[in-house]
Amino acid sequence: MSDVDQGQTPSAVAPAPSNLADAYRAAFRAHPAGVAVITADGSDGPRGLTASSVASVALDPPVLVFSLSTNSGSAAAILGAPVFVVHLMHSGGVQLARRFASTGAPTIDEPGVWATLPTGDWYLPAAASVLRCRPLSTTPIESSTVVVAEVLDIVLGTDRGDPLVYHHREFHSLSERSRLT
């Protein structure tokens, strides 16, 4: 049981920033999240972005949720697509995750980066898992949009590394050594 569970004051709690937005950013910076790359076919080829907001919602039918910043150059392609692909990344895909987090995302003519699913959709074979989805709903909230999507197909990749997580503005690998017993 932690100190908080026992009604005691936590021993290592830093004072919260005085500004709510700064405190919010600090709280979520300290909260690790799995890393995904979300792609869709755009008018100029596949477009994509890195997201740490992907979460499972339901099993039958399989539904997931994520949010994206509408300021992202790839957001319009994803929001306008009838299907998109969510790539759950592992540590072997950290360079791809970094590239999709910036403006230098891989182009379609880069060898070995892209492949096509039997449906014709582009995907990243370096991902741990590939989930082909169709949007069920979108909800704009300020400069973000929350997307709820049904998973249509799944391709499980070969194990090429430990899960990739984002924590304190950096990518980390979640290894077997990090398991708590």
Region roles according to the model:
Residues 2-181:
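Basic, polyanion-binding surface patches
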